[in-house]
Amino acid sequence: MSISNILNWFGKRGVEVYDYDSDYQIKNIGNIVIPEKLTSKNAFLLSNSVPEIFFPIDFYADRISKLIFIIENKSGREVASSELNRLISDEINPLFSFSDLVYNYVFSLLSDGNAINYLQVPSLYKTISPNTIERWDVLQPNLVEIGEHANINILNISSLKELIKKAQYLQGSGLRQDLQIDRLRIHNVGMKRRGNSVIFSEGLLWKANKSIDTLLAVYSARYNVYANNGAAGYLAHKATANTNSDLEAVIAGANKREQILKDINERNGITGRRNLWGVSGVPIEFVKTLATINELMPFEETLEDSIKIASVFQIPPVLVPRKDQSTYDNQENAERNVWENGLLSMAATVCQNLTKMFGITGNVKIGFDASNVSSLTQNESTNQDLIAKQLTNLEKMKQLNPEIDINQVITEIFNNYGKY
């Protein structure tokens, strides 16, 4: 029996595809389904199923959702008695708390690149305003189907509804609900659009798409090693005589060699649903294919990929979870830096978007209070200690330099240490 016949008998040719979509292929990995590569259609699902992708997005969504949201005036002071407080309370949705809605909003925005909001008003009202909005929902992005009008100059439109032809929401039971276009509010992150769409953005995860694709390949390879019990290589009878083997006759022709290589590569490997071992009809020794857990070094690879994905969100390596649960002395400073360089500005963006979405105008807006953030509070306490020490030295400074402007020095002290 020839090698080709043996291989054809041994298993099906090629990689077995379980589901196919025009945008990506899905392969069965154990009890879960993992797409081969990051796409615009699976970014949200990957963020909810792969820990290395989930971590940085949850890092932002969880911390921002736990902030204290307030209605404030232009000077930043809370307007406690405002009727607008209803919009940032648990009254705004019967299924989710306001904190849950903010979490869903940030998670969708950072994972999919888009937060799809739906506002509802009583049927007797025709316009959406802060006084008429009775419900706010953050729709799961992978369950929303939006048809866009083609050949429209986006520079000439005045509202989002001019771009949307039809919008539907798919519920878990298979029910399709038509959405009123004028109640949709879609917020994006990033300028780059998704494919031919002028509504949806590509999202931040695409800045690490190579690392994500590598990460998914590592998961696929690890599964195959475990599922196939670690066997890796070709098993054959070893030649005992110094004579020409059947292999020389088989590979004499270039076309035959190409056919053999193609046949082996399509069926054998450590990714997809391919075999980790094969059977040869010619006298060769066991050939190792390096498909062992130790040699794959999966934990080192996934950690490297995780660090690169987290860096997109300005999260330093010391905050990325590790298999040994190691901690670092500078983790506290690192988290404070993430707040100062990323989280605070993201929280401000969320407040600006919600203020505009609810139609809040005039001298008030939605803001947040970060006084419950321990890393920022500790930094503020440190700054207050520094201010106190600086102020106690003013008299000595005046004695050493009588011409010094005390008021100017005080102003400089508060400019340097008065804010976190």
Which ranges hold each PLM region?
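Structured, contiguous alpha/beta core segments that scaffold functional sites
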Residues: 2-295, 304, 308, 315, ...
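C-terminal amphipathic alpha-helical
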Residues: 61, 102-105, 249-272, 290-385, ...
